[in-house]
C-alpha cells in the first residue's frame, strides 16, 4: 500500500515458519514489512515489527489485514496475537510510526476476542467519517466492531443483514471497499449454491454497509 507521507510503497504482512514442508504449530510469528523506493526502483530486505512484550505477543502478525494510514504519517495496523499457552487469538490495532524506512511500535488499543473457536483474527480496518470500523474473522461467523479513535473498540457483534438474519460468512476473512459513494464489504458466504467450494470461499460478494446499524 502506498504511504503518502513518505512517498514509499510499504508492504505489510506476517512471517510463517515451516518444517518438513508443513507449517509449524504454535510457532513464533511476527508482523513483517518491506519498503519499495520508486526513485531507485528497489525493495528493501524484509524486516519485522518489534512488539513490547515478546511473551504476550509470541504469535503476533498482520496477516490478511487492511491497515489505515493517518495524515501525520502514523499507521494503524491491525494484528492478531496470542501467547504460547493461549488457544484463542486476540485482535488489537497497533499505532506505528514510519519514517520511510523503519516501522516502529508506538502503542496499541484494547484487545478483542470471543469464546468461540480460535477467537477473532485476520482483522481489517477502515474509517468512515468520524468512526473506525474493524471487520474480523471467526471460525463460526464474521464480526464487526466500531471505534471513535481507531484504537479502542466497542464489543464486536456478528455481521447481519438489514432484516436481522446472519450474513452467512464463516471462517474466512472479509475486506473493506471505502468509496465516495459509500462503504462496502467484500465477503464470502454459504447458501449460494456453493456447497462444493472449500469453506464456501467462492464466489466473492460485495454489499453496502449501513454505518448507522
Where would I find each of the regions flagged by the language model?
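Alpha-helical scaffolding within the catalytic cores
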Residues: 170-174
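Beta-rich carbohydrate-recognition and catalytic domains
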Residues: 1-60, 68-122, 126-168, 180-182, ...
Amino acid at each position: 500500500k502506498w504511504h503518502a507521507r513518505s512517498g514509499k510503497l510499504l508492504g505489510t504482512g506476517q512471517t510463517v515458519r515451516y518444517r518438513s514442508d508443513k507449517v509449524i504449530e504454535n510457532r513464533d510469528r511476527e508482523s513483517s514489512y518491506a519498503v519499495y523506493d520508486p526513485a531507485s526502483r528497489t525493495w528493501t530486505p524484509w524486516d519485522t515489527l518489534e512488539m513490547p512484550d515478546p511473551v504476550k505477543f509470541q504469535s503476533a502478525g498482520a496477516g490478511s489485514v487492511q491497515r489505515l494510514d493517518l495524515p501525520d504519517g502514523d499507521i494503524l495496523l491491525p494484528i492478531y496475537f496470542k501467547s504460547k499457552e493461549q488457544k484463542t487469538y486476540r485482535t488489537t490495532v497497533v499505532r506505528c510510526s514510519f519514517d520511510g524506512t523503519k516501522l516502529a511500535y508506538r502503542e496499541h488499543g484494547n484487545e478483542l476476542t470471543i469464546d468461540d473457536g480460535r477467537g477473532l483474527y485476520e482483522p481489517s480496518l477502515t474509517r468512515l467519517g468520524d468512526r473506525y470500523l474493524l471487520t474480523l474473522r471467526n471460525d463460526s461467523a464474521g464480526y464487526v466492531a466500531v471505534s471513535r479513535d481507531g484504537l479502542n473498540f466497542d464489543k464486536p457483534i456478528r455481521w447481519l443483514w438489514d432484516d436481522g438474519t446472519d450474513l452467512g460468512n464463516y471462517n474466512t476473512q472479509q475486506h473493506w471497499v471505502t468509496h465516495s459513494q459509500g462503504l462496502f464489504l467484500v465477503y464470502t458466504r454459504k447458501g449460494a449454491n456453493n456447497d462444493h467450494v472449500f469453506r464456501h470461499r467462492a464466489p466473492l460478494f460485495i454489499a453496502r454497509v449501513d454505518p448507522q446499524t
